């Protein structure tokens, strides 16, 4: 293996950007001269990654959103495929974004480029038949969750269980009072974290519902409640501010943070979280939460028809049971969400049971992920 190893990568959203940035950092300790290029976000770029298109171009949610942006995304994939086939990198790593990456990986593998898919698609939840497509696309899958390797081994797809980097990063115990002090929040007030998502499409669906939920909690249940809202980008912050204006909630004490999701979750008694990686962060910080989500009606209908499991939130999937409530789609009214959040806030016994279940998950996922993943990549290169 020559010294300047060329590693192409594609990440499609914030969670993939985080995973890939840790992997790049770990790979650089083994391969200091390696070059990294493709499509990635700000965290990857901070590690020296050369992103040819903005990652946001690939961040779509649900079938309807994907259809609306199909032409643009297909154009990017076509140009990217041509460029990568011309450059022939030593290895290609698709980070999540299976609908974009698997087809690309299939083409590259057929042309002799080694391919890895980092983050197994949710074949345990729906569309399990994808495992056959994955087998054609990749030389190896890097799986984040402990129930995944067996599904690949059954189909003779090389797989490495690497755990989840958030489990390495987040300490096993987080002091609520220490985080409140850091954020200058009162020690004894009811505090709710609200995580409406990281993408603009999610905010468009969820922001006003979250704001209205906060209003109801203050007006009908806990008049001194406060709400901490971490937002990933300037655009999503503006969307949330607009939702506050639209719902006439200027008097509700929202504390909007740029990023700092873990601080928001750590300071909170209870969290309201839009389904996704943020639910895993909330679980690792071990606070009770309500998981919620709204997507386009057609996308939801399709997913319900194809789903294998009764739950969608990662914490419940990993526990194999409903540890925390899920209030989805038409059920996700501000009244229902407020009632569920207040109920969790008042049930201290349940908070202890939740902490116990989430500690078990944390220990399972804590695997020194970035290093394990880097070693699997190097093994594939050799």
From Swiss-Prot:
Biological processes per GO annotation: lipid A biosynthetic process
Positions of disulphide bridges: none
Keyword DNA repair annotated: no
Pathway the protein contributes to: Bacterial outer membrane biogenesis; LPS lipid A biosynthesis
Keywords of this entry: Glycosyltransferase, Lipid A biosynthesis, Lipid biosynthesis, Lipid metabolism, Transferase
Reaction(s) this enzyme catalyzes, per UniProt: a lipid X + a UDP-2-N,3-O-bis[(3R)-3-hydroxyacyl]-alpha-D-glucosamine = a lipid A disaccharide + UDP + H(+)
GO-annotated molecular function: lipid-A-disaccharide synthase activity; phospholipid binding
Enzyme Commission number(s) of this protein: 2.4.1.182
Protein name: Lipid-A-disaccharide synthase
